[in-house]
Regions:
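Hydrophobic packing residues within well-ordered alpha-helices of enzyme cores
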Residues: 45, 106, 125-126, 180, ...
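Class I S-adenosyl-L-methionine
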Residues: 1-116, 215-217, 229
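Alpha-helix N-cap/helix-start and coil->helix boundary motif
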Residues: 42-43, 120-122, 177
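Short hydrophobic/aromatic-enriched beta-strand-loop microsegments
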Residues: 53-59, 110-114, 133-140, 188-197
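A contiguous loop/helix-start segment that scaffolds small-molecule binding in enzyme catalytic cores
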Residues: 2-8, 80-85, 141, 149-263
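Class I SAM-dependent methyltransferase SAM-binding "motif I" and its flanking Rossmann-like core
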Residues: 94-164, 207-210
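Acidic/glycine-enriched edge-of-secondary-structure segments
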Residues: 55-67, 135-146, 168-169
């Protein structure tokens, strides 16, 4: 490493709640000279970098964001000017965060880098819901997958991964939930497979909808409100679907009781 270059720290900001940030991440933010942050980073987390210059670099699914090659260049340029450079990413940097592209670019430029892990949304949702993603006799494996396919990638890869998993968590998928449900059923998953749609995991405004693949593929209205959302699929979520069905029956009974008897 050139003696005049700083270190770039790829830091996981966690799933949203500021108090789920790691101690190491908080200490780095306090020392940072400059922070390049993603769209989903909580303002209270960003506020920990009191002395740092803060630069938004987008990276929100489906919306305008800074091109990755420009982010890479800005990180390299910043390392030549500052001692502590933080690249702050939602969740964990190494999971759907394009961290490897940044690491490769930094190493090619002779810049030292460090990765600080963060709590990913799937684990935050599991904790909030008090539902283990693995369960003896039911789920021996968990797959984290995204249906977003890049140039040269085969869509069948993510489909196969989701279908083979005991428990599958799909990131960046809520906007196409109905078509995903149809695709998974067409490729062999049971129509009654439980699904949870979890939005804003770890935050006070977190919402959860329990359903099945069959019901999900028939839903046409928007199911989320713009926050980061997960599709969580597997038999470990059966209890939540059963509870939702019971509530639906109770609501139907109440509606019937409210109908006045005809004369």
């Amino acid at each position: 490493m050139n003696a005049q270059t700083g270190i770039v720290h790829l830091v996981g900001a966690g799933p949203g709640a500021p108090d789920l940030l790691t101690v190491r991440a908080a200490r780095l933010l306090a020392r940072a000279d400059i922070v390049f942050y993603d769209a989903l980073v909580h303002p209270e987390t960003l506020a920990l970098a009191e002395r740092a210059e803060k630069i938004a670099v987008g990276k929100r699914c489906g919306k305008h964001s800074t091109l990755q090659r420009f982010i890479n260049k800005r990180l390299i340029d910043a390392a030549h000017k500052h001692a502590v450079v933080v690249r702050l990413k939602g969740g964990d940097p190494m999971l759907f965060g394009r961290a490897q592209e940044e690491i490769d670019a930094l190493q090619a430029a002779g810049i030292q880098c460090e990765v600080v892990p963060g709590v990913t949304a799937a684990l935050a949702a599991s904790a909030d819901l008090k539902i283990s993603l693995t369960r003896r006799g039911m789920s021996r494996n968990v797959t984290f997958v995204t249906p977003r396919v890049g140039e040269g990638e085969d869509a069948s890869d993510w489909i196969r991964s989701a279908c083979d998993a005991d428990t599958a968590v799909l990131y960046m998928a809520a906007g196409q939930a109905a078509s995903i449900a149809s695709t998974l059923i067409d490729h062999g998953l049971p129509a009654d497979m439980p699904v949870l749609i979890v939005e804003n995991a770890s935050l006070p405004q977190m919402t959860t909808m329990a359903t099945t693949l069959d019901a999900l593929r028939s839903i046409t209205e928007r199911m989320t409100h713009g926050g980061p959302a997960l599709l969580m699929i597997g038999r470990v979520f059966q209890r939540e679907v059963d509870a939702q069905d019971a509530m639906s029956v109770d609501d139907a009974v109440l509606e019937l009781l409210a109908i006045p008897l005809s004369a």
